């Protein structure tokens, strides 16, 4: 993406920075989804079978076609849309606030990565204990970052995209623009699904 931008005359440090942040986020997401079996043949998010059973096959297919598939695509577009606002500020130097927000994004990404690992370790240990016939306690992770919050990874994910929205705002001096829709809709999605 950065190569094409340079080749087409869109070279800009701000756009490069945003591209790097999105790529790092995507790498974490890809790794985490893959290790849970998401890329195996027939693999899917653990919530879909639960929802499919709750709704029944016909209602689930309708829900999938009218909400899940379109919403995810629109949401991915909207959370990345602040890049468009950043592009409008191309050619201006990066501001200190943008660099501070980029650092905060990386801290949140690290926070989410640690939470993901803690959750992974917990579920691996829980499965091993079940297989050995040992008690697993209440079944909830309550140590590490999960001692602070039931969903520290969700907090970090939502916060990253609010920070991502704020970066181009810092570049343009425009505190509010249409691309806020991505952060708002992501927040609503997490709120509605937990």
Language-model-detected regions and their locations in the chain:
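Juxtamembrane interfacial secondary-structure elements that flank transmembrane helices
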Residues: 31-44
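Hydrophobic transmembrane alpha-helices
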Residues: 3-29, 33, 73-118, 123, ...
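Juxtamembrane helix-capping/reentrant segments at transmembrane boundaries
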Residues: 1, 41-67, 135-146
